[in-house]
Amino acid sequence: MMEKHYVGSEIGQLRSVMLHRPNLSLKRLTPSNCQELLFDDVLSVERAGEEHDIFANTLRQQGIEVLLLTDLLTQTLDITEAKNWLLETQISDYRLGPTFATDVRAWLAEMSHRDLARHLSGGLTYGEIPASIKNMVVDTHDINDFIMKPLPNHLFTRDTSCWIYNGVSINPMAKPARQRETNNLRAIYRWHPQFAGGEFIKYFGDENINYDHATLEGGDVLVIGRGAVLIGMSERTTPQGIEFLAQALFKHRQAERVIAVELPKHRSCMHLDTVMTHIDIDTFSVYPEVVRPDVNCWTLTPDGHGGLKRTQESTLLHAIEKALGIDQVRLITTGGDAFEAEREQWNDANNVLTLRPGVVVGYERNIWTNEKYDKAGITVLPIPGDELGRGRGGARCMSCPLHRDGI
């Protein structure tokens, strides 16, 4: 029976979610390569895995189905067409040369699908291929150089794809370190039995083209419900990407308006959900910088001719209130004094995952903000994040909802 895939809000009952447990890709994160791979630090992989297990089990205990990306990818590789497509896209003739690439693909094709999935996310070094594969390319590389670089940011399943009402955007990622992630998700959504033949829309990102500056990441996309989508214009999500997604949503009659808000272009504000999440019907968790009156905000609507009508909004909060039909948005700001609030925002105090209205999962270390949630009537299910938090992502970043009720 085909599973239902629909995300109608940020706060309706969460029913199914995709996570990725830390694995080989994080073991290959080092002080010398972590910046290139978009991490600020190296993690204790074993401890991060334990913390992730607690996160996953917290969701399961709430009756939420948890699917793991590595399992989905392994099962997708059982389909020969999917396996061949992934090998062709991840082991490119143009990057490795046709002879060497052909030999590496042939060797990988003989692996168990579990091991192949492990390398598709964890990377492959020259030292791991058999000595029988000889080539000029091999001769000019060290054994610890990567044939396929690891994808440690797969941990943040929110970004690579995001479900919006009756469809999914498979996102063209902004940074080279993350762009190969998209092909793993494209294969899963195209061939895995859970999704193949499903009656859902692919809005954006599932074509073999260079998306250039039209990049989009799911951490910037909030499905606030009632036909509205809120998108942050960040260092990762561009106006071009937002326009393409908005046009697709309107074409398929899946949204009535898209609210675009300009974010500061710095690391601590990498995505909208690092500074703002929807946690109850009228309630948002925010780091105050994003709701300043001088922040640029627009509402996009269909112009009736296949294009977009753009309306400048006076404030982000006013735009949200109009979209949701509420009198006033209630804000819960990051807790503590100025120093504590900055520290807790950095440690993802605002990046909580809402399970149902007024119930969220967040890192236990953010004591000041969690106390404010509690006083405001929001239930926090705490999870450890001393290691996971080093990746600069919280519970929302680490989850891709596949089925969630509307409001």
Swiss-Prot record:
Assigned GO CC terms: cytoplasm
Pathway in which the depicted protein is active: Amino-acid degradation; L-arginine degradation via ADI pathway; carbamoyl phosphate from L-arginine: step 1/2
Keyword presence, DNA-binding: no
Principal subcellular localisation of the protein: cytoplasm
Enzyme Commission designation: 3.5.3.6
Pfam families, per database record: ADI
Entry protein name: Arginine deiminase
Organism phylogeny: Bacteria, Pseudomonadati, Pseudomonadota, Gammaproteobacteria, Enterobacterales
Gene designation per UniProt: arcA
